[in-house]
Amino acid sequence: MQIDDALLSKLEKLSSLKINDDKREEIKRQLSEIVSFVDVLNELDLKGSEAVVSSIKGGTLLREDSPIASDVIDIILKNAPSQEGHFFSVPKIIE
């Protein structure tokens, strides 16, 4: 699948994002690479293969969890087209 301007515009509208004109070609190229990779994965013959949740024997490796101060919410929200408090504000699409 090739990502063209029409599809990119549709994705912009659905995601409520605005892609700058100087980044459009780069984004189209990156999205095309992602779709091509998924197409390659779809070609794999997995008949008879059992689903694997984790390849690590003995469970998941754990790390120590320690709280740290972060301003990640403010960084993310400054890119939002609309926000209410510390949340994204999106248009209602379902009645």
UniProtKB/Swiss-Prot annotation:
It catalyses: L-glutamyl-tRNA(Gln) + L-glutamine + ATP + H2O = L-glutaminyl-tRNA(Gln) + L-glutamate + ADP + phosphate + H(+); L-aspartyl-tRNA(Asn) + L-glutamine + ATP + H2O = L-asparaginyl-tRNA(Asn) + L-glutamate + ADP + phosphate + 2 H(+). Pfam families: GatC. One of its GO terms (biological process) is translation. It comes from the Bacteria. The keyword Translocase does not apply. Disulfide bonds: none annotated. NCBIfam families: gatC. HAMAP family: GatC. This is Aspartyl/glutamyl-tRNA(Asn/Gln) amidotransferase subunit C. It comes from Campylobacter curvus (strain 525.92). The gene is gatC.
